[in-house]
UniProtKB/Swiss-Prot annotation:
Protein's name according to its UniProt entry: Uncharacterized methyltransferase YodH
Sample GO molecular function, one term: methyltransferase activity
Keyword list, A-Z: Methyltransferase, Transferase
Gene behind this protein: yodH
Organism expressing this protein natively: Bacillus subtilis (strain 168)
Signal peptide: none
């Protein structure tokens, strides 16, 4: 795991994906299945989005490979009175039967996974015609190789694609159809400042990691963006 991901875990950063919770809400309001359909939050982090779905009475299940993040998610669910099943596992080895979910949600998780395995597993656990909703980092334009390597090494990305490449990849891994989604500012509700659930002990080096993250995002803002896609099995 990259030091960046360790930092997110120790800081308990909620909504650590493009747009945060406001973005997630707007995407789900447009794309989520009906509330009786089971959803898997694959890489749930602190459980912020899953809790939102739980309060809407979705039968949601979460999985995350990071034990610290998962404990913080479980604590959130308990504090909010939500009975959400939570499993520690990797996307590449999901502990669920085939065709278990109508929807899999991935918020800035696929970019850190071994795509060949993770997309195969997501497809396996999706019901026929089920959907994968992804909010992922994406390049706005081709990035020079040295700078791209710097970003991948710092964040721990296994891939860093342009939006069109994401759609080609998804179709190559067996998804029948993909759609791009865009949001307007009026689609999103105001959300307060980024929420954190800090671990008791945090090495000062992780504060340096956070500062480097801010610097890289500013330095490479002309290249770094995001994409929202829906892929149908």
């Amino acid at each position: 795991m990259s030091r960046y991901l360790e930092m997110l875990s120790l800081f308990g950063v909620a909504g650590a994906h493009p747009g945060g919770l406001a973005f997630s809400k707007a995407v789900l309001q447009k794309a989520a299945p009906s509330p009786d359909q089971p959803i898997l939050d694959a890489g749930c982090g602190t459980g912020q989005t899953a809790a939102y779905l739980g309060h809407l009475l979705y039968p949601v299940t979460v999985v995350d490979k990071d034990p610290i993040m998962l404990e913080k998610a479980k604590k959130r669910f308990a504090n909010e009175g939500l009975a959400i099943p939570a499993y520690q596992a990797e996307l590449e080895h999901l502990p669920f039967s085939s065709e278990s979910f109508s929807c899999v949600l991935s918020e800035s998780v696929l970019s850190f996974s071994r795509l060949t395995s993770s997309l195969q597993e997501i497809s396996r656990v999706l019901k026929p015609s089920g959907m994968l909703i992804g909010i992922e980092a994406a390049l706005k334009k081709p990035m020079p190789p040295a700078e791209k390597k710097q970003m991948m090494d710092f964040y721990g990305f296994t891939c860093l694609h342009e939006e069109s490449e994401w759609h080609k990849l998804l179709r190559s891994y067996g998804f029948q159809k993909t759609e791009a989604m865009s949001l307007l500012p009026e689609d999103m509700e105001f959300e307060p400042t980024t929420e954190m659930d800090l671990s008791q002990t945090i090495d000062p080096i992780y504060y340096d990691t956070l500062q480097t993250h801010y610097q890289l995002m500013q330095l490479y803002s002309e290249y770094m963006g995001h994409c929202i896609f829906i892929a149908y099995k």
